[in-house]
Structures are given as C-alpha cells and as structure tokens.
C-alpha cells in the first residue's frame, strides 16, 4: 500500500495533473494506494506523523520542496517509513541533487521498482530541513514576494527580485562553527544538504545529500556595483571561486541574526532568529 500525500492546489495546477497521471498508472498496474489531500498549512506534517507510526509505511510525497519539507517534519519513526518523491510543485530544487527524475512517470517508476537509499537531513531541534537553510538576499525576495498583492506567479516573483536588487542590503549575522564565533555582514548565506534554491540557483554547488556534511556558503558584503556580476556567477555555480565567498563543510553550525534578518528552510520563511543546525547522516530512507 502506498500513501500519497499531496496539496491539491499546489504547483499552479501541476499537482492535480500529476496526481491524475499517477492514479492512472497505479490503477493500470493494480497497485493499491490511498490519496491524502492536505487541507491546510502543515497538514502534510500531521498526516506523515500518523502514517509513520505504522511499520512498513510507503509514503509518496507529491509537490515541491515545501511539501517534502512538511512530510519530513512529520516522520516520527524513520525505521517505519520509505519515502518516495514526485516533484510537481512551484519549486523542485531538492531533486536536482538527489537524482530523482523530474518526469512524473519516471519518478513513479523509481518508486515501484523498490530500490532504496539513505539521505541526510538537517535537524534544528523543533523542525527539520531537507534541502537548504538560507538567509540574506533570497529571503528578502521571498518576503517581498509574499507582500505582492496585485501580481501573481512569476510576474510577482520577478517584481520581488528586481525590487530587492534595487534595494540591496547586507545582513548582520553571527555564526558559530567548531567552537569559533564569526560575526559577518553578508549578501547571502546557504547551508546545504541539497544545493539549489529559487528554482535552480546553485548556492551550494558542491553539496551532496548523502555525505554526512553540511555545505556552508557565505557571500560576504561587497561593493554594490559587483552584485550583477556575482549573480551571473551564481547561475553557473562559479560564485564559490570569488574572493568574497567562503565555502566549508561541517556537521553543525549555529547562526544568529544580529539585526532584523530572517531565515528560510526549504523555501519557507521562518520566524526564528537563532538556528542550531545539525546534520543527521543517512537517516531518511528513500526510493531512489
């Protein structure tokens, strides 16, 4: 039995199209399944929590990084659960590093073949993160995007991006790594299990989802006239070669906002201004 968890209105209608494809294929193969449609924010977490209490539970999470995040946060007993991913959300960044197919039929085929592997995730005490925890410019864009009322979809996001770049600011953060405290003024920071954000921006290009490490990339304050060229480097994952950028691996990092900066986990803005992030290596069992 497969338990499908899906946001029925997610992905600008793509979730429903993908669900119909999956149901048709499963019905043709006479594979038993139950569809759990989420009704409100964090409902996927509640559903996953209940399902994970039963042994040999096969969960198919359908959606984007936010949906995968919610399902991960709900798992109580990792030994009971094997998780399959079908990406059909507005942001599908985790699969760019995990190797899961983007095509719905191919992703389902991976699940039905039954081959499993284990991936890392990030533990923050009260929550978890599968892909990237971030701060700085990308969060400023998300905050502005959430406030745009007259535009929708990509038009709203592009407006938020342009607005943020025209009003660039740097963020005062404190990091503690391996007992060393560092106060930074940053343009952007990414702490990655996966490596991509924003639908394809490789902020942590060297991250691997099963290496037992967090990849930390810090883009430090720079002259504002350099920002356009830095963004071009971002598109190719070449920003880590720039002298203003620091990149290192660790198994734990503490990050604290020293100003009004906010953070995001898997593309979702959070209110916490102090994050204690630890990698949990090879814990999450997935169809791969």
Report each predicted region and the residues it spans.
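Glycine-rich beta-strand-to-loop/alpha-helix junction loops that act as flexible
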Residues: 8, 62-64, 86-88, 193
């Amino acid at each position: 039995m497969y338990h499908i968890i899906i946001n029925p209105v997610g992905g600008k209608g793509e979730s429903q199209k993908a669900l119909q494809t999956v149901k048709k294929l499963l019905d043709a193969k006479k594979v038993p399944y139950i569809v759990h449609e989420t009704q409100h924010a964090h409902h996927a977490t509640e559903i996953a929590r209940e399902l994970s209490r039963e042994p040999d539970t096969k969960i198919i999470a359908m959606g984007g990084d936010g949906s995968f995040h919610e399902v991960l946060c709900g798992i109580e007993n990792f030994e009971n659960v094997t998780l399959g991913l079908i990406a059909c959300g507005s942001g599908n960044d985790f699969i760019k590093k995990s190797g899961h197919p983007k095509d719905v039929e191919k992703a389902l085929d991976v699940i039905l073949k039954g081959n499993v592997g284990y991936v890392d995730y990030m533990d923050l005490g009260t929550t978890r993160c599968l892909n990237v925890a971030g701060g700085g410019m990308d969060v400023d864009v998300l905050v502005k995007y959430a406030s745009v009322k007259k535009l929708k979809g990509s038009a709203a996001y592009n407006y938020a991006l342009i607005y943020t770049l025209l009003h660039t600011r740097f963020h005062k953060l404190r990091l503690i790594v391996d007992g060393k405290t560092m106060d930074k003024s940053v343009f952007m920071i990414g702490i990655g299990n996966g490596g991509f954000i924003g639908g394809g921006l490789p902020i942590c290009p060297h991250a691997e989802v099963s290496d037992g490490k967090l990849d930390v990339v810090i883009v430090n304050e720079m002259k504002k006239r350099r920002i356009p060229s830095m963004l071009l480097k971002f598109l190719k994952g070449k920003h880590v070669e720039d002298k203003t950028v620091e990149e290192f691996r660790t198994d734990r990092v503490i990050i604290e906002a020293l100003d009004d900066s906010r953070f995001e986990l898997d593309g979702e803005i959070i209110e916490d201004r102090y994050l204690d992030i630890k990698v949990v290596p090879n814990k999450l069992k997935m169809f791969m």
